[in-house]
């Protein structure tokens, strides 16, 4: 029996095999390639899903982090979204990656096929604003912070965002500090060992609550999404009754909600090439 949900999950970028800067699996079964699959497999149990591991990055063999790289990643991902929509196999597209390159362009494509497109940052922000007055973002590097800052403004969430807190664990790239390794810190945490990265995230989350007024915690880069259960547990143990969200879960669940509602996006926000009606004026 065909499942109700048929999703195409598309990573933000891919890296060539053998890249020394890879921070996630580059090949293998989809369950092994999808980061933090164990944290979202219960949400995918009722979904027929395929995964594209992302178009190979054109800027180099390291993960995307700054504006130039995000622009190139967006241009490479958009054709994958169109292919997914044209295939007729899917009723939603889920864009993986916290910085959501190509999201608005993908929504425009999806609208033409009546297919909703969701992304991690957008989904987290909207769920967060349903749960509390203001949210803070735990993020990993200065350049990514400022890219994400603009993303928050683009989604008109600047009045609901308390702060972006930088834990300073940049993604691997040429000339970077290899001692501050996200994969190594993740491995320690999963093994039940002390992780400086987890401790830093806890410190910054508490500061976001006490100093910035955050009532919900979210994440910027998807390389940090694995922190969600660790941070949620630690904050609860400290007595903070605050939800901690991560992007994959939010994007998957928002896609389900949109399929259930039979909506994709407003045709006034994303008009087709030859709309039946036009507006003479757009106000702010």
Predicted regions and their residues:
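N-terminal beta-loop-helix "entrance" segment that forms/cooperates
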Residues: 48-74, 175-176
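Short, glycine-/small-residue-rich phosphate/pyrophosphate-handling segment
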Residues: 126-168, 256-284
């Amino acid at each position: 029996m065909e499942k109700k949900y048929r999703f195409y999950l598309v990573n933000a970028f891919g890296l060539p095999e053998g890249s020394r800067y890879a921070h996630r699996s580059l090949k293998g079964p989809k369950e092994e390639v999808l980061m933090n699959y164990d944290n979202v497999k219960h949400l995918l149990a009722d979904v027929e899903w395929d995964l594209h591991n992302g178009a190979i990055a054109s800027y180099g063999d390291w993960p995307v982090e700054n504006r130039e790289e995000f622009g190139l990643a967006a241009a490479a991902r958009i054709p994958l979204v169109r292919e997914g929509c044209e295939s007729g196999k899917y009723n939603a597209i889920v864009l993986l990656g916290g910085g959501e390159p190509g999201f608005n362009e993908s929504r425009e494509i999806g609208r033409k096929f009546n297919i909703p497109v969701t992304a991690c940052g957008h989904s987290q922000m909207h769920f967060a604003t349903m749960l509390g007055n203001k949210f803070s973002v735990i993020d990993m590097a200065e350049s990514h912070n400022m890219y994400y800052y603009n993303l928050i403004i683009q989604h008109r969430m600047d009045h609901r965002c308390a702060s972006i807190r930088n834990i300073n664990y940049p993604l691997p790239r040429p000339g970077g500090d290899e001692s501050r390794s996200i994969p190594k810190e993740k491995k320690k945490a999963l093994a039940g060992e002390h992780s400086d990265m987890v401790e830093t995230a806890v410190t910054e989350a508490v500061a976001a609550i006490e100093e910035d007024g955050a009532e919900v915690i979210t994440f910027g880069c998807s390389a940090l999404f694995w922190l969600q259960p660790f941070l949620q547990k630690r904050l609860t143990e400290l007595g903070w009754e605050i939800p901690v969200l991560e992007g994959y879960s939010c994007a998957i669940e928002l896609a389900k909600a949109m399929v259930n509602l039979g909506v994709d996006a407003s045709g006034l926000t994303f008009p087709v090439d030859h709309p039946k009606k036009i507006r003479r004026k757009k106000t702010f």
